[in-house]
């Protein structure tokens, strides 16, 4: 059984032209299992799988420090 019990989707709006760079940066982060550039309201959607909500909070806090990210939303699976 996997120890990564918390699954979340992180959406971000980024500065124009930085979509691919930010998505690549996210994909290299620990516990980010997928990072996609999308069309529509959100520029990037990333899937995060981690051990607990405290670790998820730390990951989201670290992601939000990326200067090209201007707006975010996170959905946590039940």
Give the role of each language-model region.
Residues 1-78:
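A compositional/biophysical signature of low hydrophobicity enriched in polar/charged and small residues
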């Amino acid at each position: 059984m996997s120890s990564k019990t918390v699954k979340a989707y992180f959406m971000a709006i980024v500065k124009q032209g930085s979509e691919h760079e930010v998505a690549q940066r996210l994909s290299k982060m620990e516990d980010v299992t997928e990072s996609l550039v999308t069309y529509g309201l959100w520029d990037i959607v990333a899937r995060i799988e981690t051990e607990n909500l405290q670790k998820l909070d730390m990951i989201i806090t670290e992601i939000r420090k990326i200067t090209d990210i201007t707006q975010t939303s996170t959905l946590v699976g039940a």
